[in-house]
């Protein structure tokens, strides 16, 4: 994993807070104390204040709002607890006649500093109480002793639930009642995470020796094939390092065992009974893609149902409590039933403008367990034709062509890793393998020149995707259309090189309606256009094959004008100077297909 971060002239934490307030009209910044507060004073409700070391964004400042979450958040330096002075400033900035609830994660520095601020507030006659969030299950009861569990992503749920309760029930809610309820919420939370590496900390002008972590030891960077379970959000070591990296399905199964096992008495912090309502939170630790995050959620939900008979009544997936750029995720479960408050789901569903609570769903009434629906039926009509072709020759040409493409996949992938996004070889191989499969299963009507091309279009469109898939699909579909039009105007006929050459020209013109790329633009057109033009002129497949090959090779000297290759720096191309330059991967792939078809044609005794 890269250890690089951008460099900042100004204080990173303060710049972050300023940026947050610039983009959110509902909050203000006490710059000298690094405190973000709600722009509205609501002294008729219990105020909620939280905070801690920076690096866990959007927690905590991203949860400050006017409508039912935090009223203030205090930011320390990265992974370092804020000072008591800062915290006390937040308390004074958001006074309340009904009192202030201070929520902290269970780390020694936070408890000491926030606790002292609470005591100072009480000494001045203010009503203030401290609630400590602890939801980690990775460290068992025997080891954590008097320290308790670490505070992790469950803190986000605590903020949301208690913030909404204080807002919605402000007229009838007392501080001691909110504290008692908060303790029940915390007692019914469990969280565990997994990561591919420890996080990297940006350089900063204001370094501090202490941090929020209670870990007295350093950490070792994980090896490239290693992962870790139970890693803390301040780089604290977890409970297990292992190699090789498992599938997410296997990893999720292990993580859920830590959360839900009834036989592991050391970690059985929360009991989940059959009819309990359970809330699930999938949290991005900072470096996990959104694509992966929802896939992880899907796997978690499936395993909760199949192995534990748990169907979460609410699912929240996103970036809530991070560890800078941590390449991992955490799973949090809340037993909503055992908190004893029938309105707890209403608190979770309450709409908020806080940017840190990144779930905009407040109405769950339309939720269904089976969310899969059938695709609409599309009547594509009968593509059958009276355009005949020798089925054996056709099969041989297809098989030889796609096998040649598959053999070139590693080289095409290498080229595209530099010139594009690295998927060209795999995309072409996917389409080729799908055609081989269709041939093996007899799914192509190879006696019908038009119907078979329509079938191949469907296969290519489904298997390939991307730009290549689109170009191939349009061209093959247009080729089928041209062959069909000839039948409609002239009647039944058998494919010959001459009829094919005319339809290839028509197909190329159709393709040109959808792409501005032409020969010389360093795309697959550099192989396709010369092939079609030479074939139309000479009706000689060998000459046309050579034209395609020469066109593809010529791209080694061309400047890219289309696609991702057009953005690549010139120095990236230098590693291929020994072979004449870096060619366009798509052109090389198409030339391989044409070459394979040509080889098979001249080996066959049957000719068109």
Swiss-Prot record:
Per the record, its GO cellular-component terms are: cytosol
**Residue numbers binding substrate:** 53-56, 105, 110
| Pathway assigned to this chain's UniProt record | Polyol metabolism; glycerol fermentation; glycerone phosphate from glycerol (oxidative route): step 2/2
Q: Which residues form the DhaL domain?
A: 392-599
Q: Which SMART domains match?
A: Dak2
Keyword set includes Signal: no
Binding of ATP occurs at 421-424, 467-468, 523-524, 584-586
Q: Where in the cell is it found?
A: Cytoplasm
What keywords would UniProt list here? ATP-binding, Cytoplasm, Glycerol metabolism, Kinase, Nucleotide-binding, Transferase
Q: Does the keyword ATP-binding apply?
A: yes
User: Which Gene3D superfamilies does the protein's record reference?
Assistant: 1.25.40.340, Dihydroxyacetone kinase, domain 1 (3.40.50.10440), Dihydroxyacetone kinase, domain 2 (3.30.1180.20)
Enzyme Commission designation: 2.7.1.28, 2.7.1.29
Please name the PROSITE patterns in this protein's record: DHAK (PS51481), DHAL (PS51480)
Pfam families this protein is in? Dak1, Dak2
Q: Which reaction does it catalyse?
A: dihydroxyacetone + ATP = dihydroxyacetone phosphate + ADP + H(+); D-glyceraldehyde + ATP = D-glyceraldehyde 3-phosphate + ADP + H(+)
InterPro entries per UniProt: DhaK_ATP, DhaK_dom, DhaL_dom, DhaL_dom_sf, Dihydroxyacetone_Kinase
- State the protein's purpose: Catalyzes both the phosphorylation of dihydroxyacetone and of glyceraldehyde.
* Family per record: Belongs to the dihydroxyacetone kinase (DAK) family.
Entry protein name = Dihydroxyacetone kinase
- What is the species of this protein? Komagataella pastoris (Yeast)
